[in-house]
Design a protein with these regions (language model features):
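Acyltransferase
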Residues: 188-203
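Short amphipathic alpha-helix with an adjacent loop that forms part of the alpha/beta core around
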Residues: 37-45
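A short beta-strand-loop structural module common to alpha/beta enzyme folds
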Residues: 27-36
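Cysteine-nucleophile active-site neighborhood
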Residues: 45-133, 197-199
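Catalytic beta-strand/loop cores that center a nucleophilic Ser/Cys/Thr
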Residues: 117-175
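Two-component/phosphorelay signaling modules centered on CheY-like receiver
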Residues: 18-26
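Proline-centered loop/turn at the N-terminus of a beta-strand
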Residues: 75-77, 93, 139, 158, ...
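Extreme N-terminal starter segment of soluble prokaryotic enzymes
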Residues: 1-5
C-alpha cells in the first residue's frame, strides 16, 4: 500500500483533495499543515500532494524546502500553489496576472512531452502519464492570480499544459517524478479531474 501525504498549505480546498484521493484508493491519507511536520518525517511517504493555498510559495512553511529535499526521491504532485512552488524551486519566476481567476472554468491544452522526456531520460516513464486517456483539450477549474512565467523557464522542466492565452497550466520535471497543475483537479469545475488523479495515484 502506498503511503500518501497531503501537504496542506492552509487551504479550504485541501480536504476536497483528501476526499478525492481516499475515494479513489479506499484508504486513509495523512494530512499535515506546512509548518506542522518535520522535514525528515516526509521521508516516510511514497507520494506527496502539495495542496493549493493562499499567498506565495516562500510564505508557505516547508513547501519549498520539501521540494528541494525530496524531488529526486519521491513522487510529487503540486496543485495551484504547489505547482507554482515546484516551478520556483527549480528556478522559475512567478508573474501576477492582471485578471484574477476565482472559480472560473477555462479550457487547457495538453502539450505532448512524451518524446522529449524519453529522449532526455529513456529509463523514465512517459512524462504525461498524468494525462493518460484524457483529451488534448479539457475544461478545468481555476482559482489563482499568479502563474509560472515562461521567461527564464528552467531547462530541467517541461511545460505539459497551457491555457488559451498560452500561460503555463502544467509542468513536469524531465527526470524526477515531479509534476504540477495550476488548475484544481478536485474542483467540480474540472470534470476530468478524478481521472487525472487516478492516473497520478496509479503511477
Amino acid at each position: 500500500m502506498k503511503r500518501i501525504l497531503v501537504f496542506d498549505n492552509y487551504d479550504s480546498f485541501t480536504y476536497n483533495l483528501v476526499h478525492l484521493v481516499e475515494k479513489i484508493l479506499h484508504q486513509q491519507v495523512d494530512v499535515y499543515r506546512n509548518d506542522k511536520i518535520a522535514l525528515e518525517k516526509i521521508n516516510d511517504y511514497d507520494k506527496i500532494i502539495l495542496s493549493p493555498g493562499p499567498g506565495l510559495p516562500e510564505e508557505a512553511g516547508l513547501l519549498l524546502p520539501l521540494i528541494k529535499e525530496y524531488a529526486s526521491k519521491k513522487s510529487i504532485l503540486g496543485v495551484c500553489l504547489g505547482h507554482q512552488a515546484i516551478g520556483q524551486a527549480f528556478g522559475a519566476k512567478l508573474i501576477n496576472l492582471k485578471t484574477v481567476f476565482h472559480g472560473v472554468a477555462t479550457q487547457v491544452q495538453i502539450v505532448d512531452t512524451n518524446k522529449a522526456n524519453k529522449k532526455a531520460n529513456p529509463a523514465k516513464k512517459a512524462g504525461n502519464d498524468l494525462y493518460e486517456g484524457l483529451p488534448q483539450q479539457m475544461e478545468v477549474g481555476r482559482y489563482h492570480s499568479w502563474v509560472v512565467s515562461e521567461e527564464g523557464f528552467p531547462s530541467e522542466l517541461n511545460i505539459t499544459a497551457r491555457d488559451e492565452n498560452n500561460y503555463i497550466m502544467g509542468l513536469s520535471h524531465k527526470t524526477f517524478d515531479v509534476q504540477g497543475v495550476q488548475f484544481h483537479p478536485e474542483s467540480v469545475l474540472t470534470p476530468l479531474g478524478e481521472k487525472l488523479m487516478r492516473n497520478w495515484l496509479a503511477s
